[in-house]
């Protein structure tokens, strides 16, 4: 047996069907697309068209608005912080802020700031600087002997006072 003699088992690889190559091919003329018209054409589909019936996006009323001042915080729970400290990803002695969390890979990005949530237990004494925190999170950090400093949201930092 040589490398040049190795081949697939018969029927292991099926030949692809070439469409539009004559009636005798079994997939000629219309090529499996039915008759002529819009549906026979390439990629033509009217989005949301329901055959003349009033489409859903026009049947339902408009609702709400997009607040351009909305702030979106990246959220982190105490148990995630404790896991990162246990794994030595974060130094418990240093100040923990948005930049250090992103640099350590605990958060992917900090968006408009970081908000600390109170799920889980915290054993380490931490100094945390975040843009928002729940009461339970602040209590848990202070109970462990640490402190939480609330910063102004990132969007406000760039504005003139």
Swiss-Prot record:
<dbReference type="InterPro" id="IPR021131">
    <property type="entry name" value="Ribosomal_uL15/eL18"/>
</dbReference>
<dbReference type="InterPro" id="IPR005749">
    <property type="entry name" value="Ribosomal_uL15_bac-type"/>
</dbReference>
<dbReference type="InterPro" id="IPR036227">
    <property type="entry name" value="Ribosomal_uL15/eL18_sf"/>
</dbReference>
<dbReference type="InterPro" id="IPR030878">
    <property type="entry name" value="Ribosomal_uL15"/>
</dbReference>
<keyword id="KW-0687">Ribonucleoprotein</keyword>
<keyword id="KW-0689">Ribosomal protein</keyword>
<dbReference type="GO" id="GO:0006412">
    <property type="term" value="P:translation"/>
</dbReference>
<keyword id="KW-0699">rRNA-binding</keyword>
<keyword id="KW-0694">RNA-binding</keyword>
<dbReference type="InterPro" id="IPR001196">
    <property type="entry name" value="Ribosomal_uL15_CS"/>
</dbReference>
<comment type="subunit">
    <text>Part of the 50S ribosomal subunit.</text>
</comment>
<feature type="region of interest" description="Disordered">
    <location>
        <begin position="1"/>
        <end position="43"/>
    </location>
</feature>
<comment type="similarity">
    <text>Belongs to the universal ribosomal protein uL15 family.</text>
</comment>
<dbReference type="GO" id="GO:0019843">
    <property type="term" value="F:rRNA binding"/>
</dbReference>
<comment type="function">
    <text>Binds to the 23S rRNA.</text>
</comment>
<feature type="compositionally biased region" description="Gly residues">
    <location>
        <begin position="21"/>
        <end position="37"/>
    </location>
</feature>
<protein>
    <recommendedName>
        <fullName>Large ribosomal subunit protein uL15</fullName>
    </recommendedName>
</protein>
<dbReference type="Pfam" id="PF00828">
    <property type="entry name" value="Ribosomal_L27A"/>
</dbReference>
<dbReference type="GO" id="GO:0003735">
    <property type="term" value="F:structural constituent of ribosome"/>
</dbReference>
<dbReference type="GO" id="GO:0022625">
    <property type="term" value="C:cytosolic large ribosomal subunit"/>
</dbReference>
């Amino acid at each position: 047996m040589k490398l040049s003699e190795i081949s697939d088992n018969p029927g292991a690889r099926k030949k692809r069907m070439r469409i539009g190559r004559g009636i005798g091919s079994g997939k000629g003329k219309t090529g499996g697309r039915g008759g002529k018209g819009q549906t026979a054409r390439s990629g033509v589909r009217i989005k949301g068209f329901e055959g003349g019936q009033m489409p859903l996006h026009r049947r339902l009323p408009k609702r709400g608005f997009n607040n351009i001042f909305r702030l979106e915080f990246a959220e982190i729970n105490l148990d995630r912080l404790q896991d990162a400290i246990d794994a030595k990803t974060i130094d418990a002695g240093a100040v923990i802020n948005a930049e250090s969390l992103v640099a350590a890979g605990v958060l992917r990005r900090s968006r408009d700031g970081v908000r600390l949530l109170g799920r889980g237990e915290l054993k380490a004494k931490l100094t945390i600087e975040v843009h928002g925190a729940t009461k339970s999170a602040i209590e848990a950090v202070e109970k462990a002997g640490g402190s939480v400093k609330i910063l102004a949201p990132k969007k406000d930092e760039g504005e003139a006072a």
